[in-house]
Regions:
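…primarily DNA-binding HTH/wHTH and HhH modules…
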Residues: 5-9, 211-212, 222, 230-273
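Basic/polar phosphate-binding segments, predominantly the helix-turn-helix DNA-binding elements
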Residues: 169-198, 220-245
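An amphipathic alpha-helical interaction segment
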Residues: 82, 101-163, 169-183
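N-terminal regulatory/effector-sensing and dimerization cores
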Residues: 4-98
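Generic hydrophobic, amphipathic alpha-helix propensity
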Residues: 147-151, 198-199, 203
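Basic, amphipathic alpha-helical hairpins
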Residues: 137-141, 154-167, 186, 190, ...
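Glycine-centered loop/turn positions within well-structured domains
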Residues: 69, 192, 204, 217, ...
């Protein structure tokens, strides 16, 4: 492992249903990620600007999935907790946002900062589940969404990132449904269209490699993008940054991975290059 990474305080824990990031914010343009983002300042404050004209300053913001926004920080680094929408009840986001916008917001901001310190100290210890991370950050696990087994299987196919590209037709066939019926079921269950879901998961998969010295054109193909131009446009849309800027700002980022979402989670695997 690179000494610079080993000594860095920047870290990212990637889980199937959560991401905990504490590191450089960069200078992002407008972004539109496909998951709920809870931003917390490490020092100073944050500024959130939304596509509908909203402009607010504070130490904590919760932004729902697929909402265009720009986030900036007084300090170079910030914390971001990412929650995948298909993993929690449909009303969980609104309930959490309500809590965070009220008197509890400051308490939760403190919890998330404490979670950062705790995760930093636990680098070489046992793994952590989504429920445990939720409790560290929000005081309790977020209510889980119950999904149709056919949708669960299709999600597992989408996030495998190996072999032939996953299509709605292939998932529908595996589920024993027509393509139109499957697409309806998928959106009904997850609240997201199949196409948007697949695009977000593909962009999210990039995070696993963010601190590595890779040929980006080859990485784009490996992840499933048809070409480098499509790759760059997609990443900029979701993250507000070009792929090269993400990799440049992640050189000293220690990346950890917890492979399962529930109880019995495996220990972290460090991917620090």
């Amino acid at each position: 492992m690179d000494a610079k990474v080993r000594e860095s305080s920047h870290l990212m824990l990637i889980m199937p249903e959560r991401v905990f990031y504490a590191g450089l914010l960069g200078r992002p343009r407008e972004r539109c990620p496909g998951a709920l983002h809870v931003y917390v300042s490490i020092k100073g404050g944050l500024r959130l600007m939304t596509a509908d004209g909203g402009d607010a300053c504070g130490e904590l913001f919760a932004v729902p999935p697929n909402q265009r926004h720009t986030i900036t920080s007084d300090f170079r680094s910030a914390i971001c907790v990412v929650i995948e929408p298909e993993s929690v009840d449909a009303g969980a986001f609104d309930a959490l946002a309500g809590r965070l916008s009220g008197a509890e917001g400051q308490l939760v901001a403190g919890r998330i900062r404490a979670a950062y310190e705790q995760l930093h100290d636990l680098q070489c210890r046992d793994g952590i589940t989504s429920a445990e991370l939720d409790t560290m950050c929000f005081g309790e696990p977020l209510p889980q969404r119950s999904l149709d087994p056919r949708v669960v299987r299709s999600i597992a196919q989408i996030v495998r990132f190996g072999g032939e590209p996953v299509t709605a037709a292939s998932c529908a066939a595996a589920a024993g449904l027509s393509a139109s019926r499957f697409l309806h079921l998928f959106k009904q269950q997850t609240g997201i269209s199949f196409r948007a879901f697949r695009a977000w998961k593909r962009a999210r998969h990039l995070l696993h490699f963010a601190n590595q010295d890779l040929n980006l054109a080859h990485l784009a193909q490996d992840i499933g993008y048809p070409d480098s131009t499509h790759f760059s446009h997609s990443i900029r849309r979701f993250y507000g940054l070009k792929p090269r800027a993400i990799f440049s700002g992640s050189r000293d980022l220690a990346i950890y991975r917890s492979g399962r979402a529930g109880p019995g989670d495996s220990a972290w695997t460090q991917e620090a290059g």
